[in-house]
Amino acid sequence: MLKKILLASLFLNGLVSFSQEIVKEFDLTLEKKRDYFQVINETDKEVILFLNDKEKVSSIRFDEKFNIKDSLSTERPEKKYKEIVGYTQHEGNYFLFWASEDRKEIGVQYFNFIKKETHTAPINLELKKEKIVKELTINNTFYLITIVKNTSILKFYISDHNGNLNEKKVDLSHLKFKNSSNQTASLYSALIELGVDPFRPTVQIEHISNGSQPSLALSSKTFKVYTYKKDELIFTFDSNRVSTDILKINLNDFTADLKSVKQPEIAQHEYYSNMAKSNSFLIDDKILQIKTTPDVLFFTISDQNGNRINQFKTLREEEINYKSSDVFQEISSIHNKKVLDKPKQFIRKINNSNPGVTCYKLNGLYYTVIGSSQDIIRSAPGGMGMGGGFGGAPASFGFTSSYTIGNLISYKDKNVVYTSCLFDSNFNYVADKIETSAFEKARLFLEENEDLKERTSIFGKDLYKDLIVFKFNSLLYLGNYNKQNKKYQIFSFTE
């Protein structure tokens, strides 16, 4: 065991040696109540940062080398607008969409750097018997998506080039959605069935973006939405252990298609089949599925029509013959990390938790992580425990913090067990060393630098309130407001 702990320590020491580059630093004074937002303009190779406090919104436009091109400032919208939930951009016009906490109030803020113009206006939006599904910006267009209660009808409120939101109704009643018992149900019933509070049903769908490598804490969620295609929205549902449902909505004509990709079948009374758990992850045109019991682990790769590409089966006493790293358990911090000695520990622990798989592609290879994530809850002052999140409040991130910040710090207050794997384009195992990703470098940098943390009294945890993370020109960037020195800093991390 000591040897394993030493190996984990050597791994961390190796990570510390990776350097990050500070690409930009400039003077900036912001008040206490502050938040941040970024827009990436790939066409013109620009980054626009919106740096907001309780009184004003300061927008700064950078070129691709982070030289400041120009800036605009205007008043922050009314107090009822709590956060930025998305944006749209077209030919030099930028529109930020602000929303109240309950999303009953929506406002739009306009910026044009060439004309040096800004203005703010309310948007009249009546949500009738609707629940918010997700707020997304795809291909420079903002989508506010709702579902009509007790139906399979989605409503899309879509931004146009003038900052308006136009409604499009998508009726999915002809499609057969499944609940956790693998029975046919409305989409609304399937989505709210697993909610924490039955008296206040909510729709919780995790956004998987290509902005940074997704963590297991996000990919282990039951419902996910993928936005890696510019003209298609893809939802996955893993509420039952029989199959993964894939819902695709074409964003040009809003036609929809639902497919079901089966998980491996486990015979009744075999491998503790009644304790099976499963999940999935999409990448390119493939679906990666994990299914586990206390005695067996299946990892299956198929195309999104269900045609199998490869499958790995591991029994609890067997070595995982397709892994490229040790099996790690990480509790709350990358510094609280140990190596698990026995394969059965891995299979047992992920089955006792929320199993998941995550993957990203680099230089033609698929870098894959298999494991699980579980909330660490605080049962009493000074006490800790494991659970599903009922005893503590998880960090909440609006669009201002973006998917990537929530992703980067998502292992905070988590018990995560994982191993890394490397595959070729056909998902054959590649016996090669896995290099440290930009995501892991940024995560370690975050934990090593106390200046990046804002100490708060909420459950005694650190909230990274002054950070943004974004991908630009194939690099990962971390932006931070240093309130002590009144400076804004941007760091870069390479693969």
Residue ranges and their predicted role:
Residues 37-59, 85-101, 108, 133-157, ...:
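Short beta-strand elements that form the blades of beta-propeller/WD-repeat-like
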Residues 68-104, 122-129, 263-274:
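Blade-loop segments of beta-propeller domains
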Residues 204, 215-333:
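Long, internal scaffold/assembly segments composed of regular secondary structure
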Residues 55-60, 103-110, 151-159, 241-249, ...:
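Structural motif
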Residues 1-24:
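Bacterial Sec-dependent N-terminal signal peptides
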Residues 20-84:
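Start-of-domain marker
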Residues 75-78, 123-126, 169-217, 259-273, ...:
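Surface-exposed loop and turn segments in beta-propeller and other repeat-based domains
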Residues 31-40, 78-88, 125-137, 178-179, ...:
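Repeated scaffold domains used in trafficking and secretory/extracellular systems
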